[in-house]
UniProtKB/Swiss-Prot annotation:
Entries under HAMAP family matching the protein: CTU1
GO biological-process terms attached to the record: protein urmylation; tRNA thio-modification; tRNA wobble position uridine thiolation; tRNA wobble uridine modification
Provenance organism: Drosophila persimilis
EC nos: 2.7.7.-
PANTHER family: ATPASES OF THE PP SUPERFAMILY-RELATED, CYTOPLASMIC TRNA 2-THIOLATION PROTEIN 1
Annotated metabolic or biological route of this protein: tRNA modification; 5-methoxycarbonylmethyl-2-thiouridine-tRNA biosynthesis
Protein name per UniProt: Cytoplasmic tRNA 2-thiolation protein 1
One Gene Ontology molecular-function label: nucleotidyltransferase activity
Localization of this protein: Cytoplasm
Length: 343
């Protein structure tokens, strides 16, 4: 016997919402999913009329659903926003080159301007080349740092007021767990914030999908027949986040509400008044936001260019010793060449 839609629309239920357990027809699920995102946007005052917003587009399910819903809600509720797509090409053969085709399809489907920036043009390196130097153990460190700054660079080029990212509830819960396990109180303080950055020297980032479950995003994309790229990054299996994700999935089996529980716990965390956070400023080399001098992106890039790819991995003191040692070796080499030329 078919189950009726809980919204009492008279239709048979087509699915069960992972977030609430409600049996709904497709149309009522769409309405509920979109209404929740609209509530998140309006209650958190993420945007103001007349603003230009860059939607971070990767071609994956999250960014595709974000672009679709942002366009839909902007028109339905008259937000008055100018929406553009911003995509970063990390230079990963067999992954990003294919996903960018999906991003271009999103551009055509949603009639949004698209800007693509590559690591190669920004840093002179692709992730494929970086991995050939560093190996697969720390590649996500490079990619994450470069990608965050690349989005800032792209946003500045586009002169946008904010960047909307596709981080969903699962992503945020995983990040809370990762920061707890690593003892990273600085990131733990801000990882549940729906808006980060902002101020004179940085463009704020917002997370309209903060309370949207990954499973529901997949269901929405599936039933809406949205075009998205579903292949996982070829370097992702070695990421530390994967362990947090697996742990979260195990917890979800025994406590279905654990994703929202972790997010709410992260939002309510209190820290000692004596706990110190790094002061966020701007990098004295590249001019982009940073809590260290020089910024992590500049340190990693310097290491690559010096032939010391592990320069930015680990403590700063270790990196300083590596630079000092290399400079000393270069000086000795130059001195030896001068002596040789004298003869």
């Amino acid at each position: 016997m078919p189950i009726n839609c809980k919204a009492k629309c008279g239709k048979a239920a087509a699915l069960k919402r992972p977030k609430t357990g409600d049996a709904l027809c497709k149309e009522c699920f769409f309405a509920a999913f979109e209404a929740e995102i609209h509530h998140t946007i309006t209650s958190s005052k993420l945007f103001r009329r007349g603003e230009k917003v860059a939607v971070a587009a990767s071609g994956g399910k999250d960014s595709t659903v974000l672009a679709h819903v942002m366009k839909l809600l902007n028109e339905r509720h008259d937000y008055g926003l100018e929406l553009v797509l911003l995509s970063i090409d990390e230079g990963i053969t067999g992954y990003r080159d294919d996903s960018l085709e999906t991003v271009k399809q999103n551009r055509d489907d949603y009639k949004m301007p698209l800007k693509i920036l590559s690591y190669e043009e920004l840093y002179g390196w692709t992730m494929d080349r970086i991995v050939s130097q560093i190996g697969r153990s720390n590649n996500c460190t490079f990619c994450g740092v470069f990608r965050r700054q690349a989005l800032d660079r792209g946003a500045r080029l586009l002169c946008v007021d904010s960047i909307a990212t596709g981080h969903n509830a699962d992503d945020i819960a995983e990040t809370v767990l990762m920061n707890v396990l690593r003892g990273d109180t600085a990131r733990l303080r801000r990882c549940t914030d729906i808006r980060t950055g902002g101020g004179e020297d940085s463009i704020p980032r917002v997370k309209p999908l903060k309370y949207s479950y990954e499973k529901e995003i997949v269901m929405y994309a599936h039933y809406k027949k949205l075009v998205y790229f579903s292949t996982e990054c070829v370097f992702a299996p070695n990421a530390y986040r994967g362990h947090a994700r697996a742990f979260l999935k195990d917890l979800e089996k025994v406590r279905p509400s654990v994703i929202m529980d972790i997010i709410y716990s992260g939002e309510q965390l209190r820290f000692k008044d004596t706990a110190k956070n790094p002061v966020r400023g701007t990098c004295n080399r590249c001019g982009f936001i940073s809590s260290q001098q020089p910024c992590k992106a500049c340190v990693l890039l310097e290491g690559l260019n010096r032939g010391l790819p592990k320069l930015g991995i680990g403590k700063k003191s270790k990196g300083d010793r590596m630079i000092a040692k290399q400079d000393q070796e270069l000086a000795l080499r130059e001195r030896a060449n001068l002596v040789k030329n004298d003869f």
